[in-house]
């Protein structure tokens, strides 16, 4: 049986539908034998989440909050694709503060398109340097 050693699609209390802090997530990861977690809160186009300045603070997030649990932490974002060209909701400046990014189509941020439009949007988002 395979064992998960990392999870990089996670949300903290900064995302409207999540309930844990970074420290609580590190505790849970340790309990499950993981080695790495990635914090990927939603970008600002998602209603009820943080604005872009939240991601600016990733330069100073105390990653050591998870070190006591033997867990490495990456700071990322779940970017919202906002058009069919693949534009996302964080500018290059804020993206530079991230370790990684996930691009997702959410119907709260973009009107669902055809299969071709959605594919074009995701391919465009993959051109992002993160």
Protein language model regions, located:
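Short acidic/polar active-site loop segments enriched in Thr and Asp
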Residues: 35-36, 40, 99
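Extended substrate/RNA-proximal surfaces in nucleic-acid metabolism proteins
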Residues: 43, 47-130
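Short, contiguous clusters of charged residues that form electrostatic/catalytic patches at enzyme active sites
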Residues: 23, 27, 120
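Non-catalytic positions within long, well-ordered alpha-helices that form the structural scaffold/packing
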Residues: 26, 30, 126-127
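Glycine-rich anion/phosphate-binding loops
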Residues: 16-23
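Conserved, mostly hydrophobic/aromatic
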Residues: 9, 29, 101
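Histidine-centered catalytic micro-motifs
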Residues: 5-16, 39-43
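Catalytic phosphate/metal-binding cores of nucleic-acid and nucleotide-processing enzymes, i.e., regions
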Residues: 2
């Amino acid at each position: 049986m395979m064992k998960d050693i990392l999870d990089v699609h996670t949300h903290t209390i900064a995302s409207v539908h999540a309930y844990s802090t970074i420290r609580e997530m590190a505790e849970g990861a340790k309990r499950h034998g993981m080695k790495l977690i990635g914090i990927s809160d939603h970008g600002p186009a998602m209603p009820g989440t943080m604005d872009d300045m939240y991601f600016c603070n990733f330069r100073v997030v105390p990653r050591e909050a998870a070190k006591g649990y033997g867990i490495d932490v990456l700071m990322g974002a779940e970017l919202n694709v906002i058009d069919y060209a693949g534009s996302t909701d964080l500018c290059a400046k804020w993206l530079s503060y991230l370790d990684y990014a996930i691009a997702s189509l959410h119907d709260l941020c973009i009107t669902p398109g055809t299969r071709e439009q959605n594919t074009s949007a995701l391919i465009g988002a993959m051109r992002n340097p993160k």
